[in-house]
């Protein structure tokens, strides 16, 4: 217990757009600067679950790492994440199951100012052997405006 890791990522407009395309969450709060300007946030914010996905990345790639199986996650969103924010996920092992290779992780996500934007706990089935893997980079994504798709019809 007590093992810990951090994972840091810059949140860009391109990542927010890609997350919207993949998730199907096209809420204008995330994608339309004119709409977002009328909200209490005053500008576009990232999807909450994009922040949650960074926790998943830290679990899968760092602690416990490749071969991990995500069992459950509790998550509270504490503050908005704006485009251009740099988020740091901190995972800390707070419990180990006595008979199974399960661990509980405290999950904290902070922005570049040290402000908590999300926190929670994750239950993970850790691999029982050390996995050595070659990380294959994902394919490049190219977002195409929906309007340009209809022009090709």
Regions found by a protein language model. Give the residues of each.
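Proline-rich low-complexity regions
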Residues: 28, 64, 80, 126-127
């Amino acid at each position: 217990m007590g093992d810990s890791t951090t994972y840091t990522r810059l949140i860009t407009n391109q990542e927010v757009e890609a997350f919207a395309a993949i998730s199907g969450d096209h809420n204008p709060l995330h994608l339309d600067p004119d709409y977002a300007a009328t909200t209490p946030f005053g500008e576009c914010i990232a999807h909450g679950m994009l922040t949650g996905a960074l926790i998943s990345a830290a679990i899968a790639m760092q602690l416990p790492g490749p071969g991990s199986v995500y069992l459950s996650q509790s998550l509270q969103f504490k503050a908005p994440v704006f485009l251009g924010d740099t988020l740091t996920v901190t995972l800390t092992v707070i419990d180990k199951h006595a008979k199974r290779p399960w661990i509980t992780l405290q999950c904290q996500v902070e922005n570049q100012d040290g402000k908590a934007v999300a926190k929670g706990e994750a239950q993970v089935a850790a691999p029982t052997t050390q996995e050595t893997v070659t990380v294959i980079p994902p394919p490049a994504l190219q977002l195409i405006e929906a309007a340009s798709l209809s022009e090709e019809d």
